[in-house]
Each structure stands twice: as structure tokens, then as C-alpha cells.
Amino acid sequence: MAFMGTSSAVHPAILVILDGWGYREQTDGNAVAAAKTPIFDALKASYPFTLIHTSGKAVGLPRGQMGNSEVGHLNLGAGRMVPQELVRISDAVEEGTLLSNPELLRLCRTVRERGGKLHGVGLVSDGGVHSHIEHLFGLLDLAKREGFETLFIHGMSDGRDTPPTSGVAYFEKLEARIAETGFGTIATLGGRYFGMDRDRRWDRTEAMYRVMTETGPGTGKRASETLRESHAAGKTDEFVLPVRLAAGAVEPGDGVIYFNFRPDRARQLTRAFVQADFDGFVRPYLDPLAFLTFTQYDATLPVAVAFAPQSLDNLLGQVIAHHGLRQFRIAETEKYAHVTYFFNGGIETPLPGEERSMIQSPLVPTYDLKPEMAAREVTDHAVAAIETRQYSLIVINYANPDMVGHTGNFDATVKAVETVDACIGRLVEACVRAGGTMLLTADHGNAELMWDEQGNPWTAHTTNPVPFILIESEGLKIPGWGTDVQLRAGGSLGDIAPTILEILGLPQPAEMTGRSLLGESEIEIRTPRSPLRVGL
């Protein structure tokens, strides 16, 4: 389809995603409440506001399961509740169909014929964001049933989607399962900071890769013991240094099963193993190596996939492209995949008329050292994109509340929230000048809960709702002004895409089963009047 020319300015719909900015009435341990947010407060008081659900069944997860950025952006872009891989794989484990998965059986057969070893790689916790320990238990059952002497486990400790020192309990559970069944070997251990980097910090990936591939007897210690020693030395689960515990290196002829189901933090380590032309760091190419991932991490990777991607049609970006309209996506490195790959339903290639901008995240060990991250640079480029007046849809992600919130540093998270608040103000001004409509929301909670009831740091996401504010501009308006409009209550992330389509005057496809948050409101042209000024 031909794209609309830019000779006549468009009135954009601007979706601003405040990653990890949840809503919670209690102020104790609430970095959002503690922060000075004059822009957000003024917008909330003067424009249509509601709370939306971002966790559990509302976004395709099990009841009570906290949301995350992948799930959030997938639901945002799809305009519907999308059943998640966590549920899909858990059902396969529970129902026993994992044991007959054709791709898993094919890999096992190949490795047996070569006389190789079988390895399981992934995050060992029940956080449910990247993996689940029950999936590893299912894999142990499969490997034993397929006649392998053992499954060599290369386990990564969490401490990010779970409490910072909870890894001991997870690895004790794994050790107990191994002792009970007499099957399985924890060969290596390392914090997710190393094995699950997604920001091209190749030195981190290399540290995990080396431990997994270099031969040796290991320390002979239990994983749980090693974690306790790490905690005593001041390193929480996320930052445990990679170490070999027992013999069982990944070697040519072996098979590797990566049991994480979320792609973004599993890609780098996978590439190091399977890409012949890999250049992240110098390493010998292990060939032959049978490699399988639980889900599709990247369609270009030469790996088998146990659970093929589900097809999603008529997503928001596709509808925009189908109508010949232009769109713009922007985020810093840490969240770039979310506004592109995940927002587009797991498709890497840009849509027709879709332009992207990735701003480099600061190169610091942890983001509490620079809570501003790249928010100001993201805002600079976003404002410039708005001012071109050529994009009908602009999607912006601010990573700060989530990424700094994950560090557990309360004061730094407060500063992160305040940084984003100032950036929102600049976006509002640009939106006003462009005559656009801004939809301000979040993908899940995090920064609103920084410690638990016992006063321990809480670094994981939450099940709290998130704010949704509809910010009107001049020209194209929602009927009513300010608090006159009552947005529909009880909505979820899948309802935002239908809301955007209604604002843009585009038909909602049948596959998009979410419901517009505008309720009975209708779009109309109104007499221009000065929009709210928020002290900018």
C-alpha cells in the first residue's frame, strides 16, 4: 500500500510507556509516591484517568502471576489478551506432552547417535518471567526417559524477578529433586547478570560461556552452598560469579536445551554457541552442536525450537501500516526489543512505514549508578519525531522506573521516576504543538514497591495496576474536557490498541478483541481551546 504523503501534517497518537511505573495507594516503600512528579500529578488531576490490569489472566498469564515487559508490550501491540508461553509450556509439563515433543525427541536422538552429552541451560527460579523451575523438572524427566546418563545443568540464579537472596531455596529444591530421582548434575552456576545480558556487554556473556565450555572437575561444592558463600561476600543472586561446580563441559557432539521461554535475555548466549561468524568475543566454534531453544529467540538463529511461535494477525502496527500511515518506535537499548519485536508480535523486521530509533543505554554496571539512564536522549529524539508531523503513531518507552527499580536502590529509583516525569513534560509540549493525543501508561508495576512487608528489598515486578491517562491536545479531541470524560474502568493492556484506533478513526479488526477505554465516547472536531499547562 502507498503511504500517505507528509505535505499535510498529521495529528499523532503518542503512546508513552513508563516501564515499571505501577500504582499503589500505600506510600511505604513506594518510590513513585516518594518522587516529586509535578507533571504526572497535574496530568492525573486534570485529564481522563483510570487504572488498568497488567498481570495474571488479564494478559494471558496464570492467575496471580506478575506481568513483565515482554508480556506487556505483546498485549499492547496485539490489542487483545495473548496467551503466554509460560502457560503453554507449563501445561505441556503438567499434561506430560513435553515428553513427546517432536523437536525435543529429535534433538535427543541426534545426541545419542553422536554419543554426546545432554545439557540444560536456563534461569532456575519460579519467577515466571523468563523461565520456571517446573519446566526444568520436566526436562529432567525427559532426559532420564530418553536414556541419558545425566542432564548437565548450567543454572543461572535470579534475584531480579525473585527476592535478591532467594536462590538458595530454588537450588536446594533442584538439589533435592536430583537426590530423589538419582538423575541430574548441576555442572555450572552463574548469576543472570552474566548469562542473560541483553545489552551487548559481551564480557558478561563470555564469562558464562567460558565456564560452560572449559573442561575441569569443578569446585565440588553444591550450588546452594556456593550461593550462600556469594551472599556472605556481598553478592546477591543476580551477580553470582560464574563457576564450574562439576565436570560436564559443553563440547562438540553434545546437545544443549535452553529452557528459558523469553527471548530477549537468551539471545546473546545462544548466539555465542550457534553462530559460525560470531564476533562478540573470540572463542572456538563448537561443531557439531545440537542446540534447541524452548521458544523462538530469533528466526535467524540456526536452532531447533520446541514451541513454535503462535501466529498473531492484525496487530496495531499492522493496521497502521495497512492504512498507509507512518509510525515511529523509540526506546533505549534495554527496552528497544520491546517497542519493536515484542510490540510487533515477535516479528523482527520493521513493518512498511515503520521507523525505529534505538538510544544506547549508559554503560554502567547497574543502573542505580546512573538513574537518568538515556531518558533525556530518548526524549530529544521523540520530540524531534513528533515535530516532523508525519507519524500517525509514535511509541515511546522509558526504561528508568523498571531498570533502576530492579536494583533495589530506593533513592536511585526515586530519581529515576523524577527524571521521567520531567521528560513527560517535554513530550506534552510537543504533543500540544502537533495537535496530537497522548496515551500515558505502563506495562507493569515495579517502582511502586521497593521492599516487602519484612523490610527486605523487593527487586521484582508486582501485580499492581498501572495508570492510564488520556491527554488531549488542540483540534482533535475526545468529547468533554479534562475530568469530564470518564474512561472505562477494569481495562487491561489489550484495550489500549483499540483505543488508539478509535482516536485515529481507523476500524478495529475482528482479531483485535480488546475494548476501547473510551467507552461510549466518540471522536469529534472541537473548537480549539488552550490545553492544560503544567508549569513547563
Swiss-Prot record:
Pfam families in alphabetical order: iPGM_N, Metalloenzyme
Requisite cofactors: Mn(2+)
An example Gene Ontology CC term for this record: cytosol
Binding-site residues for Mn(2+) 2, renumbered to this chain: 19, 69, 443-444
Keyword vocabulary terms for this entry: Glycolysis, Isomerase, Manganese, Metal-binding
Tagged with keyword Phosphoprotein: no
Positions annotated to bind Mn(2+) 1: 402, 406, 461
Annotated substrate binding sites: 130, 160-161, 192, 198, 262-265, 335
Catalyzed reaction equations: (2R)-2-phosphoglycerate = (2R)-3-phosphoglycerate
Highest taxon listed in the record's lineage: Bacteria
Transmembrane segments: none
Family annotation (CDD domains): iPGM
Residues at the active site: 69
Stretch forming the signal peptide: none
InterPro entries given in the database record: Alkaline_phosphatase_core_sf (IPR017850), BPG-indep_PGM_N (IPR011258), Metalloenzyme (IPR006124), PGAM_B_sf (IPR036646), Pgm_bpd_ind (IPR005995)
Record text on cofactor binding: Binds 2 manganese ions per subunit.
Pathway in which this enzyme or protein is active: Carbohydrate degradation; glycolysis; pyruvate from D-glyceraldehyde 3-phosphate: step 3/5
Keyword Metal-binding applies: yes
GO molecular-function term, one example from the UniProt record: phosphoglycerate mutase activity
Oligomer status and interactors: Monomer.
NCBIfam families, A to Z: pgm_bpd_ind
Protein family per UniProt: Belongs to the BPG-independent phosphoglycerate mutase family.
Function summary: Catalyzes the interconversion of 2-phosphoglycerate and 3-phosphoglycerate.
Name by which UniProt lists this protein: 2,3-bisphosphoglycerate-independent phosphoglycerate mutase
Species of provenance: Gloeobacter violaceus (strain ATCC 29082 / PCC 7421)
